[in-house]
């Protein structure tokens, strides 16, 4: 609770200082701890949830059933989406949880999701940075390269009857080492 409140204070101060009038929504990443007593404590702070695997969705559904997670809370579904994870995300959407937002890592996930849902939903796009990889391969699990986002939006999402773009999820695989690097990557994406 202390860390959540501290993060909320820092964002509130930064938003006020920069005359930014949108809202800040803290999302607790369930992979940081699945223990019920930690989730229950976190949820006392008016937060939202971020999932990263099929394992997380039944936990989220239980929190909703217990009344601990509001029906209008955001559930950001990150991570590689295949099989059971897509089915579980679709179940949340199809049973009327309106703020379930799958964060798409690749175009195939849009196809899999749309086959599983029976109503329109909002999605996010996970933006991969152009960082120097520490490995010799690139996987789509790391997100969609910034230069591919606008073409993907125009070609697949813009007129799609089942999905609407809600957010861009900026992702740096190695974490943010310094603010200059972060702002450089963000500016490249925005251009």
Where would I find each of the regions flagged by the language model?
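Active-site-proximal beta-alpha core segment in soluble small-molecule metabolic enzymes
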Residues: 24-190
